[in-house]
């Protein structure tokens, strides 16, 4: 020990050297072995600051979920420090992005009975929301009739621009903001003309997600008359702690997100909701992904972490937030829509959607034009300064979706003199429609309808059109449908772990909004609205966060893995027409790569019968199984670990509520794989479950034993699932996989289902 201290002191005695003064400095995150701190230093901060000429270069110091710091240095300086014997990992700070009513009823939540009643609406569970902050004055954040703040709470309400501790109450019990990473990365720092250097929300996204997860009942809620009714979150009595890590027009930096994880765990949250991902970190391994690292630190302390699956669907392998200790949520529609039809001069009425609330067209027909007819893609996309006013003035303009915000295209049309817009999906979005609060009369139509409108505009000598805005309609069928934008599997890092885990409402969701910007978020939008309607996996994630709060309140002893298992094994696989779930982008039946285990069903999740628990040691074994060594794993776990030396474990044996059998592409002929699962009985003490197998096409699946007997003395039973397939004959199809399931029945009300995925691919 003395010799290692001497080595460290010798290393520290050298001044920090800049190898290239001309290099631009940037923020790097340094993962440090906290146990290596020499005893001469009173704190880790003092130790870290000895590495730099100026203490001001340190951005954050991390203590709770992560030992280390972030600092502004040159790449060569970062490489130099990488050789320090106490440095476990170094990674560059990266920018992430946000994954941007009626949904509680659609999830089966009802007053006076079921999970709301059993959990007392999530009373006293604390949800930490990592987002753009919060607008505390909204009715959704009233603390009327709430009890005192839970005594275990250790957080604070920070002061800043237009925010003070007085803005917190018994509902919003904590509010912090993390700006040091942004201030270091952005020239001139945060733009205070459009942002608040405080927890106050200048974007709206954080207010929306917070109220979706835990908003109070707000009567007579609507967005300019759309979706009128009672707005409420999934867990109306849960407490909210806002952690502002994302900044308007600047995104979210890893260094700030990691600092928020550190604070949230220290503060005492029970659930973390993080509708953030993608950006530069979309394919990073777990040990270089601060969201994965921070969420492991949280999960290891018993905190449930819910994250969004990303909005890059419907492309395969587009799902983000892949770590197995995170619950990854895709997006689906609900049974409410806002129809706005495009009416053509030839009499055809084509289905569309819109949230336009201005002066309607009242059936008046206008000339219609498609700028893309000339072959200029930028004009077809209605990009800034691409439309010829002579061509579009006084006309309805057909714009292709993509490359710029949907509502911004309408503003371009308006500036060029157009009177309206029809926004047409491309093939990638298919028939997936999202309502927007347009500034001009406008509607969105699917790919097929868009092609019809373009064909009409190009073939008719005097094409004309109008838009009919039809308000709000509920009871839409089919619903739910997997949103075309929702991130899809397979899991690009660990294909043995099916992602997303499940889907939840994420299309046209009504929730609270900021006063700082209008409903479009555009600087030119002067409108104010208490509520807004948004779509994205960002909106789906807080539904599961709120659901976790309800389950945690009803079952305080459940671990994060048990809560996720309860949700995953009790999902719905059919829509409200009693048909298989549909993929919005294709109109065809969806697969587990689209929806994971299925659609969240809170009525059944409260009493799942059997659950699959996962311990910290199980996660460590999983990390060993994918080839990580002890030092690499320590980057994630904080503490030293050991991997098995006799036999390498299989990643498929992680006790996950889904099963994926991955065979290498060079394995030809008859192959098989066996995985082990251990079920824990949380239902009646005396129970017998029997297995029912739905084998994937061309695959044989066996379960041993086929019968699980539980008693008051025996609450856990293990079973083996063996998958056998002839890779020469099996047809994997467009997805590259075939799908089945294993379901356990007790003869009563419990149906415990796990999807089975069989695929061939070579893991990284």
From Swiss-Prot:
Residues spanning the signal sequence: 1-20
Presence of keyword Protease: yes
Record-level GO cellular component terms: plasma membrane
Coiled coil residues, start to end: none
Domain of life of the source: Eukaryota
Domain PA: 377-457
Swiss-Prot/TrEMBL keywords: Glycoprotein, Hydrolase, Protease, Serine protease, Signal
EC number: 3.4.21.-
Entry's family note: Belongs to the peptidase S8 family.
Protein name: Subtilisin-like protease SBT1.6
Source organism of the structure: Arabidopsis thaliana
